[in-house]
Amino acid sequence: MKKYLMLLGVLSISSCQDGTLVNEAVLIGTDTNEAATLDKSINKKAKNIILFIGDGMGPSQVELARLSVGGANHRLSFENFPVTGIVLNSSAQNLYTDSAAAATAWAAGVKTKNGYLSVDADNKFLPTIPELLSTKGYLTGLVATSSVTHATPAAFYAHINSRSKHKRIAEMLVESDIAIALGGGSEFFKMPLSNEAIHIINNGDSLDEDNLIEYSRVLGLFGEDGLDRRLSPPTQLKMTEKAVDFLDLKTANCPGFFLMSEGSQIDWAGHDNNVKYMLSEFADFDDSIAAAIEFAKKDQETLILVTADHATGGLVLQKPRGSNIRAQWTTTSHDLSPINIYAFGPGADLFSGVMDNTEIFDRMLQALDYENLESNNCIN
């Protein structure tokens, strides 16, 4: 992550309101990494899926993150994936999607209204991929740098017509089969909780406990709402590594696991029109993916997907002036850019071309050969 932060000394930060163009100067980096494209796994069933979501991560955010580190020839960890596609992301009644509707599309495979979580536009229950996979003996984990009740993680376990009902969403997480959830949101979990039913941890050092594997469920709450970086909560990298380790060990005698890990605050930086904030969050996101790649290389049975719900901020990159790029924000809201998807591992070939965001759900199940999975209970 330091390599991103060291390159931001020339940033000129200013604030804006919607409709005002904001320019920021970003130094072109020199830490070039021209790693070879990762091998493509064809016609092989995936055992596990790790889905990375860069909230608010449009193509311009990816481009700026790359250029700020190593210039035109640099590649981010996921840009070496052998398969890429384009994802269209409108919601049920709007060209403009929010995170709730987009996450419902991946989690349940159906378009819904903005603000709805895994219920359709008529407020009818939609089974999610963790719920479907749990009947086959799979375990699921969620990681976020927001509250674990925020729209993206919540869509994988909550069924409700308002993403703002955090206390009820928190209850739904406790009632769910999610094996491990790490992020913020402690202010929403005021209900009595039995440590025997779900092990609660409130500081990052607890993630290093050797006995986490002894618990059937773990809930890590490292901030009242989103993670406040000034208070040094665990990084997305650390939370992702610990979630992967936990799920890998817990499913040693089970069919597999599903993990969603979100770089939530990439979006918040876009709303703030703050390049320095965005690149810092992006660095943690990219580091998390790099760690998952190392796991997948050894495991040989894990599909890694990297995508976004939408782009935020209307970020436009203008021609360099000397060694600086001009980064221009055009809105403090989401924009209508289509977003990319990157795939590596068994089943990656299913994610090429142009697809609707609901198709990600179907293709993930296809990669796992879901129709031929037998009913199972993961006993560990």
Region annotations inferred by a language model:
Residues 269, 273-320:
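Extended C-terminal subregions enriched in glycine
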Residues 14-15:
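C-terminal motif of bacterial Sec signal peptides marking the signal peptidase cleavage site
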Residues 204-207, 233-251:
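A Trp-anchored, charged/polar loop motif used as the substrate-binding/catalytic surface
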